[in-house]
């Protein structure tokens, strides 16, 4: 079998292969043997019907599709190796008419890894944000600690107000008919969280525990459930209880309870130092990202949509895991936020394209700059891993890791880090001051 390249352009290749008649006939026989136990005909035991009898009864091409599928993976792999192609997607496959005792012609269409040359990266420049710790940043961190140590207590004798947590029963109606998903009991809702559709929470404010009342709202025109889009709705509601958050007193005693410090000033100073360290890392990541973006801008590169699709799907899975950590599934999240999977994926697409292009230009940069990982760097990284994962026998851990497939991923990671470091060193950065950002 030899592959014939029909075309190779715009990051896509089209090529053909011929399956020899003898190979196809053998695959038909193999398919028959594999599947015959599924068939029965009158006068024969199940699984014992001769192939020709089955083909006469069910059609001559009964086993053709399965026979081709048995052969295609091997044919495809040999073809891309012979033609020296780097596919980045599953191929589309077209078959000519298939008949027994004849060669089978197969056409493959597949997206390819882009071929490109890096642009001039000798004078890269980029604008980056200044990450500066302010007093308000420190106060925000302190307030977060206060919130974390707050207690929630039930209140009586006053109306519900914003930021209260209310336990409610509700049942929704559209055109005087209850609708699916519109009913709950003892639902805890934080007023002002905008968890529900516009107008719902505002009508809870001002009511007391024990009150029963109607809430009238209108579903948004872009609501995720088609049957409810733009519809007027009535919710029969009852407030079971009202709770408020009580923050602890911010003083030296609070500081002693939540930290190793004795005074509020010492505590705030430590918070500021930690925030500044965090900002150093944020600044480094910002420089790396902007340097890669500058390299992309200097390079003429287009990528197949399939590569972007794959990255969008990967990022969506990350998003779904984060939603799960919030105690929700994606359907619940979409209902609460009035969005859809398509909306989220559309939002991810621009960043996914940037990620794909960034990976490609950085890979090319590593190749052009001949960046390699050394044994010393590998050992140093593995020693760090041994510490992090609490491996007592460091030498054994390092030896086992070096003999595992994961060592190649680690080598690539080391090369990537070195490339980013070099790229940042050779990029001129203009820092956009915090005041400039506020003015814009």
Swiss-Prot record:
Keywords per UniProt: Cell cycle, Cell division, Chaperone, Cytoplasm, Isomerase, Rotamase
Superkingdom in the source lineage: Bacteria
Molecular-function GO terms, alphabetical: peptidyl-prolyl cis-trans isomerase activity
Assigned EC number: 5.2.1.8
Coarse class of the protein's main subcellular location: cytoplasm
InterPro entries: PPIase_dom_sf, PPIase_FKBP_dom, Trig_fac, Trigger_fac_C, Trigger_fac_C_sf, Trigger_fac_ribosome-bd_bac, Trigger_fac_ribosome-bd_sf, Trigger_fact/SurA_dom_sf
Gene Ontology annotations for the cellular component aspect, listed alphabetically: cytoplasm
Any Pfam family the entry gives: Trigger_C
GO terms classed as biological process: cell division; protein folding; protein transport
Catalytic activity: [protein]-peptidylproline (omega=180) = [protein]-peptidylproline (omega=0)
Location in the cell: Cytoplasm
Chain's role: Involved in protein export. Acts as a chaperone by maintaining the newly synthesized protein in an open conformation. Functions as a peptidyl-prolyl cis-trans isomerase.
NCBIfam families associated with the record: tig (TIGR00115)
Annotated family: Belongs to the FKBP-type PPIase family. Tig subfamily.
Name the UniProt record assigns to this protein: Trigger factor
UniProt source species: Finegoldia magna (strain ATCC 29328 / DSM 20472 / WAL 2508) (Peptostreptococcus magnus)
């Amino acid at each position: 079998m030899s592959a014939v390249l029909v075309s190779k352009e715009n990051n896509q290749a089209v090529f053909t292969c011929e399956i020899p008649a003898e190979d196809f006939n053998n695959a038909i026989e193999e398919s028959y043997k594999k599947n015959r136990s599924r068939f029965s005909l009158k006068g024969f035991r199940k699984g014992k019907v001769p192939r020709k009898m089955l083909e006469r009864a069910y059609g001559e091409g009964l086993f053709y599709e399965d026979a081709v599928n048995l052969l295609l993976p091997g044919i495809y792999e040999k073809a891309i190796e012979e033609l020296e192609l780097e596919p980045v997607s599953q191929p589309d496959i077209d078959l000519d008419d298939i008949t027994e005792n004849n060669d089978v012609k197969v056409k493959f269409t597949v997206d390819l890894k882009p071929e490109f040359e890096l642009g001039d990266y000798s004078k890269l420049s980029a604008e980056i944000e200044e990450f500066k710790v302010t007093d308000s940043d420190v106060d925000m961190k302190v307030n977060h600690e206060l919130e974390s140590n707050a207690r929630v207590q039930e209140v009586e004798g006053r109306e519900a107000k914003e930021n209260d947590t209310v336990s409610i029963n509700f049942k929704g109606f559209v055109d005087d008919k209850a609708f699916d998903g519109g009913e709950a009991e003892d639902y805890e809702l934080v007023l002002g969280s905008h968890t529900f559709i516009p107008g719902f929470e505002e009508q809870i404010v001002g009511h007391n525990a024990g009150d029963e009342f109607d809430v009238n709202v209108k579903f948004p025109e872009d609501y995720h459930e088609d049957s409810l889009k733009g519809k007027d709705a009535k919710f029969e509601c009852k407030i079971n209880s009202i709770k408020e958050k009580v923050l602890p007193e911010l003083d030296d005693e609070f500081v002693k309870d939540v930290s190793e410090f004795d005074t509020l000033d010492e505590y705030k100073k430590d918070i500021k130092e930690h925030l500044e360290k965090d900002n150093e890392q944020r600044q480094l990541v910002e420089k790396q990202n902007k340097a890669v973006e500058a390299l992309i801008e200097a390079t003429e590169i287009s990528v197949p949509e399939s590569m972007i699709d794959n990255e969008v799907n990967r990022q969506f899975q990350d998003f779904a895991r984060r939603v799960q950590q919030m105690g929700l599934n994606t359907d619940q999240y979409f209902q609460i936020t009035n969005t859809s999977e398509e909306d989220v994926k559309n939002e991810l697409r621009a960043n996914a394209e940037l990620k794909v292009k960034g990976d490609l230009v950085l890979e090319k940069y590593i190749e052009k700059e001949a960046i390699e990982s050394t044994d010393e760097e590998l050992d140093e990284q593995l020693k760090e891993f041994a510490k992090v994962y609490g491996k007592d026998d460091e030498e054994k851990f390092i030896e086992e890791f070096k003999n595992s497939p994961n060592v190649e991923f680690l080598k690539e990671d080391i090369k990537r880090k070195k490339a980013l470091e070099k790229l940042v060193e050779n990029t001129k950065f203009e820092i956009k001051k915090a005041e400039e950002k506020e003015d814009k």
